[in-house]
Amino acid sequence: PQNPKTPFYHIYYNNKMLKALTLAACVLLNVQAAPAEDEFTILPNMTAMSTKSYSGYLPVTDSKALHYIFVESKNQPTTDPVVIWFNGGPGCSSLLAFFQENGPWVVGADGNNTIYENPYPWNNNASMLWIESPAGVGYSIANNTADRSTNDMVQSQDAIVALQAWYNKFPEFWDNPLFVSGESYAGIYVPYLTWQIYQYNMKANMTGQKSMNIKGFMVGNGATNWDFDVSPSFPETIWNFNLIPKKYIDFFNANNCTYYFNDFRNHTGPASCDPVWDAMQNLTSALNWYDLYRTTEAPITAEERIGKTMVAGQEKTYKRGMSQKEYTPWAKFANDRVANDFLSDYVNNETVREALHIPSYAPGWDMCWGSQFSYNLQNEASMWIYPILKGAGYKLMFYSGDTDGAVPTYGTKRWLQELNWPVKKAWRPWLTQGQVSGYIEQYDGLDFVTVKGVGHMAPQWARQPVTDMITAWIHGQDF
């Protein structure tokens, strides 16, 4: 769609999708409970999983399948909500969250080459479903060239087909409350999938089929409106963090200088904006853009970046970790410090692959996909979906680690102003064990929550506060 005001939620609901949804709804009536072939009970260097856990594939087409991990709630899996999680990118693996942010175990987080049990996993009071999306990301399968090119709409269409395949495997969770969640570029994925579920339910209601028990979504530090998010909000953010001199921000504001995520739009302002933009990025190039107050990782050599593993007697290669320059392609002068090389080695280990039921023909696991894939950004982003889902009565939450330089809180507050929804409960602190963990402002239709003193990966860097906050919210409790 080219016009975000066009009611195009009918346009994309084509016959192919309708047939797929109808078939899936029918199949759901004739399936067995949780697939034994997908269950795993332990991973290397960990103790046994404390709840039932599964890893396998969700078919989308004959040539595409999305890898998932599902871990049941420790509390009441028969009634607790199911929460879907996506990482962003676009093109980064949700195993990053499973192994470092909100899963049962923590592997190699923050430069520490250790494995330990997460004391605050999200599955304490919810069943968690991590999906590697789009096809080709991580251990998800994309078998031909066409499968390796996608966009926001196609990704969401694939995701709902995969979700139906998941319900096929786990029909006993059909009645549990369902929430969709994610961070970063999943600020696009999450509203889009929720909107697809909304459409699925409209059709189900018209045809007498059972609808999904969707309740709402949660987005963390997510891209939502390209007029404000990522690059457009970076200058004001680094000025407010005292990282650049006043003359730079004054020049930008006086000359209407605006740059956009991955340069997919032409920047505004005169050519004289360019050297000032470069100077801003140079001054911040040595920082951790994902948490402006957090240290960067130690450098490693190019040779150390190439990982090798043996799978079924054959050598597979993979990229060890990601540099900030690779992870932040819009940052012209970002540093080459590499994070998560330990995690890359762990996930690519043959024993780990076997435990997760990864087929031997699947390639090595990379944190984010490479140049053989293409993702075509759509100009609309996802803010247009918010009023639709508000009208449907869904709960919406946006939380933001307030030291993020990649998708800054400043940009989020600007598009929230653009929504122009009335405030129901004024800005106030929320606490964890008597300490301020951030602030919350409740709009008519959306809860906006900041997480104090952490950046882009708030569930990783503020484990207890974010887990407590998310748990309370999905269970309808105050925090």
Kindly give the residue locations of the regions a language model identified.
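A short, hydrophobic C-terminal helix/tail in secreted or cell-surface proteins
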Residues: 1-11
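Repetitive helical segments and hydrophobic/amphipathic motifs
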Residues: 11-14, 28
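Intrinsically disordered, low-complexity polyampholyte segments enriched for Lys and acidic residues
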Residues: 5, 14-19
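Terminal and linker regions of secretory-pathway proteins
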Residues: 18-479
